[in-house]
Design a protein with these regions (language model features):
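In a subset of proteins, long, contiguous C-terminal domains/tails are tracked
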Residues: 130-180
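Proteins synthesized as precursors that undergo proteolytic processing into mature forms
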Residues: 1-134, 138-146
């Protein structure tokens, strides 16, 4: 019997190359006893009395941390409901070779007639403050507005009466259900 548990496709979080183009070892190369650099960040939040308050997690590669942090800040600091926190627009900052870029992901807006997620249109339609976008661009940040696959955050929240409330990001195929 092996102790531990499987972390789904975590092997793919290792670097696919063991050395760089100059022959130098890559720190994130697979090796016995190593764990990969990973962005998996399922989070469990407890209240000050140590009781379960909520849990949040999302798919999304190295954007997972931002998705999960956004929901935690939204609920704890801003007092949002689980669904309001899941629906917030996402702002993902990246830097490579000293050059930064910011990707903004549309708020999950569902067309009530077609039940489709609307992902195109002016940034303001998606809950992104156009003044903040303009300010970031004026500072030299490369802003891209994502229309593709984005956050799929799910939240389970414990209400004061002990019942549970769930939320799922409308931008992906997830949903909330109850099993009795």
């Amino acid at each position: 019997m092996v102790k531990g548990f499987m972390l789904n496709n975590q092997l793919t979080d290792f670097s696919f190359k063991s050395v760089d183009d100059n022959g130098n070892p890559i720190a994130n190369a697979p090796a016995p006893g190593k764990r990969p650099r990973s962005s998996m960040a399922p989070s469990i939040v407890f209240n000050p009395d140590g009781q379960f308050l909520f849990t949040s997690g999302s798919p999304g590669g190295n954007s997972i941390i931002a998705y999960t942090a956004k929901t935690i800040v939204g609920m704890i600091d801003w007092g949002l409901t689980p669904q309001e926190a899941a629906d917030l627009p996402n702002v993902i900052a990246r830097a490579r070779n000293g050059k930064g870029r910011v990707r903004m992901e549309a708020k999950g807006i569902k067309d009530e007639e077609t039940n489709e997620i609307i992902r195109t249109g002016p940034a303001a339609e998606f809950g992104m403050n156009p003044e903040i976008v303009a300010e970031l661009e004026a500072m030299g940040h490369n802003i891209s507005k994502s229309k593709g696959e984005i956050s799929g955050v799910h939240i389970i929240y414990r209400n004061a009466d002990g019942s549970l409330t769930g939320a799922a990001d409308k931008r992906r195929e997830g949903s909330v259900g109850v099993v009795e």
